[in-house]
Curated annotation (Swiss-Prot):
Substrate binds at N9, F10, K11, I146, G181, A202, S203. Pfam families: TIM. InterPro entries: Aldolase_TIM (IPR013785), TIM_sf (IPR035990), Triosephosphate_isomerase (IPR000652), Triosephosphate_isomerase_arc (IPR022891), Triosephosphate_isomerase_AS (IPR020861). This is Triosephosphate isomerase. It comes from Pyrobaculum aerophilum (strain ATCC 51768 / DSM 7523 / JCM 9630 / CIP 104966 / NBRC 100827 / IM2). Involved in the gluconeogenesis. Catalyzes stereospecifically the conversion of dihydroxyacetone phosphate (DHAP) to D-glyceraldehyde-3-phosphate (G3P). NCBIfam families: PRK04302.1, tim. Keywords: Cytoplasm, Gluconeogenesis, Glycolysis, Isomerase.
Length: 227
């Protein structure tokens, strides 16, 4: 997993379903190539294989079930995600929370499969517990700010700083990224200045009238180098 990184979560937005998911992913890929920055996209499971076949940038799954491949109707195993072409996995988003033992199992399976692992956490202490599982990154996201347009880097900078310091002190090999309410390039720049190594966001890019222009704006701070 390369840093700094911008991860775009498509969630289950209509704007990112079907061929629209490919359109947004290609816009992200175009920006990544033009600016020379790291961008990953996380489409819905239904679009995962389609997007992975359509772009060269990293494609992450939004989550996975703890079941192994087999007779588990409606479940999605880590192996299924790998076979679909994903290169990474997001775990424990506040909209898809998991128990700690589930996160541990999924992290181990995903890493064994060669997938990047990003574990979401709501606060510094939970981020520390997540970092102890040795993911590639933890994403601190106060749930009350998600989707509000109130960027964590502006409205709760102390949460970001404490997480960066806490995880960095105990698990320096685990990167800290952040998200929740990120809407602009200015928000991304502020997050990087707080010591994070990237940003996880969704609606700002997915629901934009022109995804390419919006992703370009959001990614420019990554191209500027260390703050």
């Amino acid at each position: 997993m390369k840093f700094p990184i911008l991860i775009i979560n498509f969630k289950a937005y209509y704007e990112a379903s079907g061929r629209r998911a490919v359109h947004i992913a290609k816009a992200a890929e175009r920006v990544a190539k033009e600016l020379g920055v790291n961008i990953a996209v996380a489409p819905n499971h239904l679009e995962l294989a389609l997007v992975a076949q359509s772009v060269e940038i990293p494609v992450y799954a939004q989550g996975a079930d703890v079941e192994s491949p087999g007779a588990h109707t409606a479940h999605v195993a880590v192996d299924n995600i790998k076979e679909a072409g994903a290169s990474g996995l997001i775990l424990n988003h506040s909209e898809a929370p998991l128990r700690l033992n589930e996160i541990a199992k999924l992290t181990a399976r995903a890493k064994a499969a060669g997938l990047d692992v990003v574990i979401c956490a709501p606060d510094p202490r939970t981020s520390l517990a997540a970092a102890a599982l040795s993911p590639h990154a933890v994403a601190v996201e106060p749930p009350e700010l998600i989707g509000t347009g109130r960027a964590v880097s502006k409205y709760k900078p102390e949460t970001v700083v404490e997480t960066v310091q806490l995880v960095g002190r105990h698990f320096p090999d685990v990167a800290v990224i952040t998200g929740a309410g990120i809407e602009s390039g200015e928000d991304v720049e502020a997050a990087l200045k707080l010591g994070t190594r990237g940003v996880l966001l969704a609606s700002a890019a997915v629901k934009a009238k022109d995804p390419y222009l919006k992703i370009l704006e959001l990614a420019k701070p990554l191209a500027a180098g260390p703050p």
